[in-house]
């Protein structure tokens, strides 16, 4: 943040800042609750701290998936949509629910936390699986352990594209459980559309795979 302030502040005044971050973000108090891949931001007066770093300007913070949903509602595929769900596929699964044009936070700021949907093999080592276990990033970690090497989600895709049948089986789990998650969202929330973003959404043919898995 200091680097951003120095680079921008020397060219023009900073009037305010908006920050998206993982976790159960309380936009009113400016505190991040729950858990995420960035534990250092939880339970501290994050908005107040950021405002101080930027010279006391107003700062807004919100969950990253909700910011993605707002962006799609403003200038993306959800323009004109009043009821939709947005999910992001990265190291986990982010989610945001939009109803009557507004983000639903829920009574515990957890509405849209679809990453925790239980699914998969409950007897797998490590206990009950959840949707986030089936992202390309986490599937690559599991296959990497089998191979005895570090493997990224991108490398998992490359292995599958180059004929590695086991890698293809892991990716089939990604398609299957992503489709299952979308089906659960559709029946629970009945959105007009489900918007998919994040690094995992860049996979060519993803929508075709999901349509096949959902029987369309």
Locations of the language-model features?
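A short acidic/small-residue loop/turn micro-motif
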Residues: 40-41, 106, 111-113
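Conserved beta-strand elements of the Class I
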Residues: 85-87
